Amino acid sequence: LANTNQVVLPKYLHLDPAYPNPFNPTTNISYNVNIQQELEISVFNLNGQKIRILTNDYHYPGRYSIQFSEQNLPNGIYIIKLQGRKEVHTQKITFIK
């Protein structure tokens, strides 16, 4: 019988939940890199407009953490996008003044 409870883990990247979320004015974004690769972490509004690039750099395997801090955003939901060579991860964050 096949085990239907198996969890498939990302091969190359893992994006942890941002915290705090909702945030004002700063949230922490942590992620794991399992192979050497160039990564971009960007923040988008719900219209799909890229409002910030948090990092666009070559990463070695390991655990990383960056902060997104913004006081001039309107209240609302934003999307964090972690894009590597072979995987893309997204996550919603909420900014509340």
Predicted regions located by residue number:
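A detector of long soluble domains/segments in diverse envelope-associated and cytosolic proteins
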Residues: 1-2, 94
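Extracellular Ig-like/FN3 beta-sandwich strand-entry sites
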Residues: 36, 61-63, 73-77
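Solvent-exposed serine/threonine-rich low-complexity stretches and specific carbohydrate-binding patches
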Residues: 51-59
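C-terminal tail/sorting-segment detector
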Residues: 53, 67, 71-97
